Design a protein with these regions (language model features):
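Left-handed beta-helix
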Residues: 154, 162-336
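Unchanged
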Residues: 1-208, 320
Length: 336
């Protein structure tokens, strides 16, 4: 598995480490981290050096992988896809590229999302941004691209080498979109839970959507389990008088207050008489006694003092940053 890390790869590397929690710390293969060359941050002299070498890291990884097929996946989509079923679908068809899509209401998409243009035979002829798509007001569903593409490794290497020769310096996702146009790709429909994360608001909405039991089971309790890092912590403790409704709680926490429709990460403390509703409380956060939190995201290791009111809206959650300490009401804005 090769992960292309963003501008600052520290948090990604800190989470993945050696890949042991996913059995990726093997002698052969395993986990590879590759820096992403963000051209907005690259000095002009380095851009010149990257010309004709922009995809070298990916090519080297693919050659060393010795795999017959490769899957290119964006990190903006949350889902639980059966890659074996995708491979079977690909092998039964003639096109060298298979693209994955999900049928969704066009009203749920933003201009930056992309959709597949499908033929009557179910082939994808293009990947079009919503901002440029011509969709009838009567259209109830469109084929939203999940930015997942499958190709033979040999074909993918050739695609990257050709891009190097041309001097292309665009994202791998954009290259795959061009491959769809060139080859009339196979189109594989994904029917499970899917959420698109492109900003803080969509991240908040995706977490709230997972609290729906049907979505939760579709994502986490299908035949394909999702694994995360093992901490070997004790279960979260719920004190006498605490209340918890429609919430997800990680391990190692201590809850004295009230939880309603919230996602609580590991090792979180919520003190007595506090009310937490429609919130995301990340690892190691501390919530003081008598607080009222609604439509908020509390980042890792943040501390909220007692008797404070933190309130955002369902479309614009209030965010407390990582490690921030808030002890005065004047430090935060309250949105009604």
């Amino acid at each position: 598995v090769m992960v292309t890390v963003p501008r600052s790869g520290r948090s990604v590397a800190d989470h993945l480490r050696s890949g042991r929690d996913w059995s990726l710390n093997t002698i052969r293969g395993g986990l590879f981290l590759s820096p992403y060359n963000d051209l907005k941050l690259v000095a002009p002299e380095k851009k010149a050096a990257l010309l004709h070498h922009y995809y070298d890291n990916s090519i080297q990884f693919l050659k060393c992988s010795q795999s017959e097929y490769s899957v290119v996946m964006s990190t903006r989509n949350v889902g639980n896809i059966d890659l074996k079923a995708l491979l079977r679908y690909h092998e039964e068809r003639n096109s060298p590229v298979t693209a994955v899509y999900k049928r969704v209401d066009p009203a749920s998409l933003i201009p930056e999302n992309t959709i597949l243009q499908l033929t009557a035979k179910g082939e994808a002829t293009a990947v079009v941004p919503m901002s440029k798509a011509k969709i009838s007001p009567k259209t109830k569903q469109v084929a939203k691209s999940m930015a997942i593409y499958l190709m033979s490794t040999v074909d993918l290497i050739e695609l990257l080498q050709s891009a190097n020769q041309r001097g292309d310096m665009i994202s791998l996702e954009e290259l795959m979109r061009q491959a769809v146009i060139q080859h009339n790709a196979n189109a594989f429909e994904y029917t499970g839970f899917q959420a698109n994360i492109h900003d803080i608001n969509s991240y908040f909405a995706a977490n709230m959507a997972v609290l729906d039991e049907a979505n939760f089971r579709a994502l986490f309790y299908s035949s394909r389990r999702i694994y995360t890092k093992v901490k070997n912590e004790i279960p979260t403790f719920f004190a006498t008088g605490s209340q918890c409704r429609d919430s997800l709680c990680g391990t190692g926490g201590y809850i004295e207050g009230q939880l309603d429709h919230s996602v609580i990460f590991r090792d979180v403390l919520i003190n007595r008489d506090s009310q937490v509703k429609n919130a995301i409380i990340m690892q190691g956060a501390r919530i003081g006694a008598g607080c009222k939190l609604e439509n908020v995201i509390i980042d890792k290791d943040a501390v909220i003092g007692p008797n404070l009111v933190l309130k955002g809206t369902s479309t614009t959650p209030l965010v407390i940053s990582k490690g921030q300490h808030v002890f005065q009401q004047a430090e935060v804005a309250v949105h009604d």
